[in-house]
Curated annotation (Swiss-Prot):
Main location per the UniProt record: cytoplasm
InterPro entries registered for this protein in UniProt: P-loop_NTPase, PRK/URK, Uridine_kinase, Uridine_kinase-like
Protein name: Uridine kinase
UniProt keyword Transit peptide present: no
Gene from which the chain derives: udk
EC number(s) stated in the UniProt entry for this protein: 2.7.1.48
Native species: Clostridium botulinum (strain Okra / Type B1)
Keywords for the protein's UniProt record, in alphabetical order: ATP-binding, Cytoplasm, Kinase, Nucleotide-binding, Transferase
UniProt similarity note: Belongs to the uridine kinase family.
Keyword Aminoacyl-tRNA synthetase among UniProt keywords: no
Top-level EC class as recorded in UniProt: transferase
Entry-linked SUPFAM superfamilies: P-loop containing nucleoside triphosphate hydrolases
Pathway, per record: Pyrimidine metabolism; CTP biosynthesis via salvage pathway; CTP from cytidine: step 1/3; Pyrimidine metabolism; UMP biosynthesis via salvage pathway; UMP from uridine: step 1/1
Domain of life: Bacteria
Subcellular location: Cytoplasm
Amino acid sequence: MKRPVLIGITGGTGSGKSTVAKEIYNKFDEACIAMIEQDSYYKDQSSIPFEERCKKNYDHPDAFDNELLINHLKNLVDLNVIEKPIYDFEAHNRKEETIKVEPRDIIIVEGILVLQDPKVRELLDIKIYVDTDADVRIIRRLLRDINERGRTVDSVINQYLTVVRPMHMQFIEPSKRYADIIIPEGGHNRVAVDMMVANIKHLLQK
């Protein structure tokens, strides 16, 4: 097995980056592709009371255990199996169990700050930024956090105004300049997704 092709997919919250990642994932046989979500690498907070965990800024680079993420990506590149963490968004902490991820020809790394850390960037063969209007992103985040993460409307809006938007402007938006490809309209941009799939297939043939 050759060195895996690592693809980084980033963008603001609700931009459609997960949709783009899934669209690309579904174009390949499951035996040759794996998905690594940056959200899985939020730091372990077992020593912090739940009330304090609820107040943490989860859109800041310091919220992520990038050391572990980088270690796992390097292991996959070296064709080693990893144990990917599982994050519980309602408890704001890692679960005890993990998911075994085996090396594949293609590794997708998806998350809001994938291009922010230079040590992560240097491991990526293709860097994608999914660009979507802010009003669309906040609506998507609102629906997701209420339906999937047990949040209230007020808490989501307050978090967006005080944390999410400032962090987007400070860390996520500036990382756009490191992207090889900028995809507008998220997962609905079929032309861009098809172009990326063709490019990945070309890299695999080298």
